[in-house]
Amino acid sequence: MSALTISKEDEKRVKGMGFLNNRGTDLFSARVLTVNGKVTAAQHHCMADAAEKFGNGNLLYTTRLSVEIQGIPYDKIEEFQAFIAKEGLVTGGTGAKVRPVVSCKGTTCQYGLLDSYALSEEIYRRFYEGFQDVALPHKFKIAVGGCPNNCVKPNLNDVGIIGQRIPKVTVNSAKAAKNAQLKQHVQMVLPKL
């Protein structure tokens, strides 16, 4: 393993572009962004080709649903970015910024209670893309879960959205009217949605 020969300033600069140093070398791992982990077949082929052409041939998936391509030489970073840009792919997702938004598969999952793809894509556009020039004190993570099963762990993020079923409460139903005790205890006003 060769030692790191580039300056700390250059290392910091490319980290801001989504390239993390592979310990003790002049090689980097590129964080290729996805929206909710969704990529087209053509984008997948492009990343696989880029991994073989510029890196060590491996694709790794991060907890924030980005794709990491390891082993890219420092002097090939710009060429790598141009190569993946042909399929609309970009690198990023590092530093003290809003991180890529993650969501579960709630849109298509049998337990999903909301359209987690659409909501997280809107949040991604507004906050990840919209706040890229905003310096934060620390990384800021957002997750969207389609139901309380907690697959994507929204509660472990800085902002977590969890789909919930909204019960329909009918206080004056025939059953409630027959049960005076229930009628006394169910005194609530629900907002209209």
Spell out what each predicted region is:
Residues 1-25:
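Intrinsically disordered, low-complexity polar/charged tails and linkers
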Residues 179-193:
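Iron-sulfur cluster-binding cysteine motifs and their immediate structural context
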Residues 22-26, 166-170, 186:
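Short, ordered beta-strand-loop transition motifs
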Residues 4-6, 30-170, 175, 179:
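Small-residue-enriched alpha-helical segments and adjacent helix-cap loops
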